């Protein structure tokens, strides 16, 4: 679809697609966006080496802003990761070492850059300014502008205390650090818009207020709704664990299947948020019923996987799904994995079969699965997944871990 422009009401487009939960000044922000390029930031603490589907709404929102000509900033919390955001958590996050934080930053940047074009100035680490600020200086510049009474009214803090869970002074100060980040990005990069999930509302408005109290630029904040699936699961989680956005943690095939298996009631909402289809097409697909709705789920799975892993990976996952699930298997209804005899004669290994069909993310992942005893043929562990297969695999049961079972079928 055509990209929105500065002059169009971008806020209205984002609202129509379901991205907007709260805004500090909707009309002011709409005018600000229409006036010309705006620098907006989205922040992540480096608590893992990837992002998951729960972060995807923010990535897509930033993508829409960039398509409209605005400037994205990715803020990595190299400093705040050492503290941990207490928002709506019952316990402290584990403290990570510097080497792990840097490895996590590298992984997050790789994921982010698939959704948003990053240039040399697009990536910022808050350690750049927080590592150098003194405690007394911070209290003087920032602490004087915050009331403890008001901070205690914010849901993220109040709920933690109401449940009588410990909240360290370190964590209590997190919201001040995030407010300081916003002001520093405004000063250093001309950033005037912060994006975040609904649980970040208090942190965002504290930054807006801090800039005002210090006589700085007018800042804006926009939060997105916290998503849950219709069956009540937190977005980004599946029965098997987190739905990661990098292939090293989750194979593209499994990522594709997450979207293909979504609840019927989520299809239209997810198409609006996680694809770039025009809204007329989103509404048409979302209105389908019965078996036709499954085709809409395939469209969703293809679109989401193409953005996360590339068009080739999306096609491979879709092709694998058609081959695996189109026909019923002859053994207890197991899904099929088809192997051509020609390919078998060329020396096909289980490692190649699983990677080529997007059933595993990499050769290394297959070898690790085999080394742990999780790769089995007819219940027997596969010692060497790199060994060439023979015609004897026809009809045999292939198990990947305890829950995923397939049947191999030779085709002429």
Swiss-Prot record:
PROSITE patterns: S4 (PS50889). Transmembrane segments: none annotated. A motif ('HIGH' region) lies at residues 46-55. It is an enzyme of class 6 (ligase). L-tyrosine binds at residues 41, 174, 178. CDD domains: TyrRS_core. One of its GO terms (biological process) is tyrosyl-tRNA aminoacylation. It is found in: Cytoplasm. Its main location: cytoplasm. Gene3D superfamilies: HUPs (3.40.50.620), RNA-binding S4 domain (3.10.290.10), Tyrosyl-Transfer RNA Synthetase (1.10.240.10). Keywords: Aminoacyl-tRNA synthetase, ATP-binding, Cytoplasm, Ligase, Nucleotide-binding, Protein biosynthesis, RNA-binding. It comes from the Bacteria. Residues 348-411 form the S4 RNA-binding domain. GO terms for cellular component: cytosol. It catalyses: tRNA(Tyr) + L-tyrosine + ATP = L-tyrosyl-tRNA(Tyr) + AMP + diphosphate + H(+). One of its GO terms (molecular function) is RNA binding. ATP binds at residue 237. A motif ('KMSKS' region) lies at residues 234-238. Coiled coil: none annotated. Its EC number is 6.1.1.1. Catalyzes the attachment of tyrosine to tRNA(Tyr) in a two-step reaction: tyrosine is first activated by ATP to form Tyr-AMP and then transferred to the acceptor end of tRNA(Tyr). Homodimer. Belongs to the class-I aminoacyl-tRNA synthetase family. TyrS type 1 subfamily. This is Tyrosine--tRNA ligase.
């Amino acid at each position: 679809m055509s990209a929105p422009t500065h002059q169009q009401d971008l806020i209205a487009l984002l609202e129509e697609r379901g991205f907007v939960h709260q805004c500090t000044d909707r009309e002011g922000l709409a005018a600000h966006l229409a006036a010309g390029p705006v620098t907006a930031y989205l922040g992540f603490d480096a608590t893992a080496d990837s992002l998951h589907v729960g972060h995807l709404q923010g990535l897509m929102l930033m993508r829409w802003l960039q398509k409209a000509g605005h400037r994205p900033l990715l803020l990595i919390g190299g400093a705040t990761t050492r503290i941990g955001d207490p928002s709506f958590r019952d316990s402290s996050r584990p403290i990570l070492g510097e080497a792990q934080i840097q490895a996590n930053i590298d992984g997050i940047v790789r994921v982010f850059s698939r959704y948003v074009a990053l240039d040399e100035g697009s990536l910022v680490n808050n350690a750049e300014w927080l590592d150098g600020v003194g405690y007394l200086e911070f209290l003087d510049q920032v602490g004087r502008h915050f009331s403890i009474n008001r901070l205690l009214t914010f849901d993220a803090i109040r709920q933690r205390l109401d449940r009588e869970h410990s909240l360290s002074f370190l964590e209590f100060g997190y919201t001040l650090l995030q407010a300081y980040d916003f002001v520093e990005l405004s000063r250093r990069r001309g950033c005037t818009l912060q994006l975040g999930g609904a649980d970040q509302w208090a942190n965002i408005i504290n930054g807006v207020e801090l800039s005002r109290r210090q006589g700085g630029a007018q800042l804006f904040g926009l939060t997105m709704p916290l998503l849950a699936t219709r069956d009540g699961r937190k977005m980004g989680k599946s029965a098997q664990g987190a739905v990661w956005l990098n292939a090293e943690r989750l194979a593209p095939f499994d990522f594709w299947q997450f979207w293909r298996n979504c609840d019927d009631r989520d299809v239209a909402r997810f198409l609006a948020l996680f694809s770039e289809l025009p809204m007329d097409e989103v509404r048409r697909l979302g209105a389908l019923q019965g078996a036709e709705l499954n085709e809409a789920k395939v469209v969703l799975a293809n679109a989401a996987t193409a953005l996360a892993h590339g068009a080739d990976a999306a096609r491979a996952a879709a092709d694998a799904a058609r081959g695996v699930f189109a026909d019923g298997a002859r053994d207890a209804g197991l899904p099929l994995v088809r192997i051509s005899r020609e390919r078998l004669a060329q020396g096909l290994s289980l490692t190649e079969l699983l990677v080529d069909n997007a059933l595993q993310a990499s050769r290394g992942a297959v070898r690790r699965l085999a080394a742990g005893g999780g790769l089995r043929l007819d219940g027997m562990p596969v010692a060497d997944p790199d060994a060439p297969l023979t015609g004897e695999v026809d009809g045999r049961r292939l198990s990947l871990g305890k829950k995923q079972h397939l049947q191999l079928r030779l085709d002429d």
